[in-house]
């Protein structure tokens, strides 16, 4: 009997022990589940960038921002100013893409991202620009700076001069490449707002999109492959530029341009903890704004505009002006009908009228804010009436 009782007690204690252990496991699982949302919230907060901005490219209007004037190191986004200087000089005829750029000893020893330029090696300015914009080559940036201004110091002065002229008031450049400063040197500084200003200016030059949207390209006769650091080019079909930037102290940065139809956004993200967090954040913002906004066609090139304009001295007495260009206004989808159109035309124009001559303008407004303009021009040449006709008209006769 005692043996049976002892056996029963062993079985009972085993079952109770199992239940206690099982309950302990269950409690741990419940506890983990209970705290998971808080952990996720902390993790999500840690993935937020230090600063960002979303701008509508046509109007330059800032749609959303956080710390957009906070000065931060742009890292390789510094190279966007190099691109602007080169493209501006080419537009003015001061340089050509076929110009040959020679590599100095200093340029050949640049670290970080590079195309391993050798001292004395020469490439066309266009090849150097591809290395700069696609592969973020620091050696190419340095070589271009020396080619344009003679010395690194003089080129940096030019960079700051251009920044000031563009109204980039949060910016100070100290290098053409954006690498971390050596001991005793100052770091490059800018803001999301200033990078957006620069990006908007760069969009005036189609070449910058051609280069920055290229995922891979050959260099040095195909012996070296340029790989684009901007992974957003593969994430969203709308993304076509512009430049990433990173070093440990500043975090992950990117200046993005994206276009869908007539709608284009510029987004600048600075100080993300990881490149994945930066890209996820950028994509989320772009998707939301593409969903919320639309481009409204408010003027079509060549369409008649307003009342006829009286020609005081023309062979013909009146002419009807036309819109000089197509105009699309970005607007929230539920505000499409709120855009107002104001036509400003003179009562009369003296002398001959040339084809394409400006007669007036159309101003587009939303909430009393100007959101777009287009010239009203003459669709044809109207010569001055002869002397006899003009004299007769002064008598009041309609000739």
Language-model regions: role of each:
Residues 1-10:
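Bacterial N-terminal signal peptides that target proteins for export
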Residues 3-4, 80, 260:
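Hydrophobic alpha-helical segments, especially transmembrane helices
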Residues 10-13, 195:
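Small-residue packing motifs within transmembrane alpha-helices
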Residues 15-24:
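C-terminal segment of classical bacterial N-terminal signal peptides
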Residues 25-197, 202-206:
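Active-site-adjacent loops and short helices of periplasmic peptidoglycan-processing enzymes
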Residues 168, 172, 183-399:
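Domain-terminus/edge residues, biased toward the C-terminal soluble/receptor-binding domains
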């Amino acid at each position: 009997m005692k043996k049976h009782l002892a056996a029963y007690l062993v079985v009972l204690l085993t079952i109770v022990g199992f239940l206690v252990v099982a309950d302990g496991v269950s409690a741990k699982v419940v506890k983990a589940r209970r705290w998971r949302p808080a952990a996720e919230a902390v993790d999500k907060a840690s993935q937020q960038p230090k600063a960002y901005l979303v701008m509508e490219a046509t109007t330059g209007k800032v749609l959303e921002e956080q710390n957009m004037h906070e000065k931060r190191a742009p890292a390789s986004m510094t190279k966007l100013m190099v691109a602007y200087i080169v493209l501006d000089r080419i537009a003015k005829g001061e340089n050509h893409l076929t110009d040959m750029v020679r590599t100095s000893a200093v340029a050949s020893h640049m670290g970080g991202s590079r195309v391993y330029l050798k001292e004395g090696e020469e490439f066309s300015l266009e090849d150097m620009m591809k290395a700069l914009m696609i592969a973020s080559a620091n050696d190419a940036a340095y070589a271009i700076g020396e080619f344009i201004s003679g010395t690194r110091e003089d080129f940096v002065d030019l960079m700051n001069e251009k920044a000031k002229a563009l109204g980039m008031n949060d910016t100070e450049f100290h290098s053409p490449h954006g690498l971390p400063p050596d001991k005793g040197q100052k770091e490059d500084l800018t803001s999301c707002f200033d990078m957006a200003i620069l990006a908007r200016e760069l969009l005036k030059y189609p070449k910058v999109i051609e280069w920055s949207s290229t995922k891979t390209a050959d260099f040095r006769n195909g012996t070296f492959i340029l790989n684009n650091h901007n992974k957003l080019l593969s994430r969203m079909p709308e993304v076509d530029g512009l430049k990433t930037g990173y070093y440990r102290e500043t975090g992950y940065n990117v200046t993005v341009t994206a276009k869908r139809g007539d709608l284009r956004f510029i987004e600048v993200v600075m100080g993300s903890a990881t490149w994945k967090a930066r890209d996820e954040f950028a994509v989320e913002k772009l998707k939301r704004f593409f969903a919320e906004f639309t481009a409204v066609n408010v003027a079509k090139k060549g369409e008649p505009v307003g009342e006829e304009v009286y020609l005081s001295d023309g062979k013909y007495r009146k002419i009807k002006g036309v819109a000089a260009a197509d105009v699309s206004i970005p607007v929230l989808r539920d505000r499409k009908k709120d855009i107002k159109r104001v036509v400003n035309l003179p009562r009369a124009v003296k002398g001959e009228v040339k084809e394409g001559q400006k007669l007036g303008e159309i101003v587009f407004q939303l909430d009393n804010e100007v959101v777009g303009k287009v010239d009203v021009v003459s669709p044809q040449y109207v010569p001055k009436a002869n002397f006899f006709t003009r004299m007769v008209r002064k008598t009041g006769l309609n000739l």
